[in-house]
Amino acid sequence: MSDRKRKGNDAPNSLSNRDTVELPDDLSLSDSDSDEPLESFGRKIEDLSSSSEEEGETRQQVQSVLQENPSFRLTGGSSSFCDRSRDIFAQLDSAAKLTSKDLGEDNILDGTLARPAPPSPPHAVQNKCGVGQELTKKQPPGKKLPDYLAHPERWTHYSLEDIDETSDKKNSQVAHEYIRELQDSKRSQKAALETFTPAFNQDHGSSNENKIVFAKPKSKDQSGSRADHAKKEEVGLQHLDDRVEADEGEALQQSSSWPNKEKKRKWGVTKEEDDTVAPSAVFTSSKRVNRKNFRKTPDDNDGDKE
């Protein structure tokens, strides 16, 4: 029941009856506004003024933290060496942090190394290239005169004004006549090839020099006459053999006259044996003997003196 009474009392202030809401006379704009927005604006101003100071403090804090806990450490060695290495690597890490803030909004580090800066936009280069391309564009070529009008001296003009026009029938007749002439010339060439019989046995005085010439073999009579002629030539050389034999006989006679008695006895014995023994065949050489090669005996010298 209490809920219904509250609803009944709030009925005049509902959305449907908001135009009929009665406002008190003492109400003003200053009373309706609250002090909360003024406090929020003051806080924002204080934050902006203190942001620059906080940046410097954060940098100092980062450096101190990095110096205390560097990402890279060297263990071992003397204390002075450890202090130097710690200072060096702490400065490197702080420099990487400071440069990473200038890269952009996405301040992301891949380990201890910073991401490289993005490349500069190539808008300026594209604009320059675009201007050059527009200038280098070829203009559409205009209509040019044909060459036979621009340079008539290079061309020859043919006209058929003096020739009478002929009908189709006459043109066909001329074409048929030309075809017949070609056929007749081909037939005549074929007939000439068929009637040609190559003759191989021709005289040397023939006009066709490139043709093959065959000669008949000679008869047996001619071959016999050649043999007789060869025999005659052999007979004509017999006088040379006679001379050679005469020279050999003289040489034998000279060698038979020896002054020693023992040689004579031997010759006497040999003569008797020759008489008893039948004469044997004597072979003589056909070489010509030079008499100057034989030594002269004292009998020959006496004979020459006499």
Curated annotation (Swiss-Prot):
Q: Which UniProt keywords apply?
A: Cytoplasm, mRNA processing, mRNA splicing, Nucleus, Spliceosome
Q: Where in the cell is it found?
A: Nucleus; Cytoplasm
For this record, an example GO cellular component is: U5 snRNP
Oligomeric state and interaction partners are given as:
Interacts in a RNA-independent manner with distinct U5 snRNP-containing complexes, the mono-U5 snRNP and the post-splicing U5 snRNP-PRPF19 complex.
Location (main, coarse): nucleus
* Basic and acidic residues bias: start-end ranges: 218-243, 296-306
InterPro entries linked:
TSSC4
PANTHER family registered for this protein in UniProt: TUMOR SUPPRESSING SUBTRANSFERABLE CANDIDATE 4 TSSC4, U5 SMALL NUCLEAR RIBONUCLEOPROTEIN TSSC4
Q: What family is it from?
A: Belongs to the TSSC4 family.
- Going by the entry's taxonomy, the superkingdom of the source organism is recorded as Eukaryota
Q: One GO biological process from the UniProt record?
A: spliceosomal snRNP assembly
- Tell me what this protein is called: U5 small nuclear ribonucleoprotein TSSC4
Task: For the region Disordered, give the residue spans.
Answer: 1-81, 109-128, 182-306
Which molecular-function annotations from GO does this UniProt entry contain?
molecular sequestering activity
Instruction: Give start-end of the signal peptide.
Output: none
Question: Pfam families, from UniProt?
Answer: TSSC4
Say what the protein does: Protein associated with the U5 snRNP, during its maturation and its post-splicing recycling and which is required for spliceosomal tri-snRNP complex assembly in the nucleus. Has a molecular sequestering activity and transiently hinders SNRNP200 binding sites for constitutive splicing factors that intervene later during the assembly of the spliceosome and splicing. Together with its molecular sequestering activity, may also function as a molecular adapter and placeholder, coordinating the assembly of the U5 snRNP and its association with the U4/U6 di-snRNP.
Q: Where is the composition biased (Polar residues)?
A: 59-81, 198-210
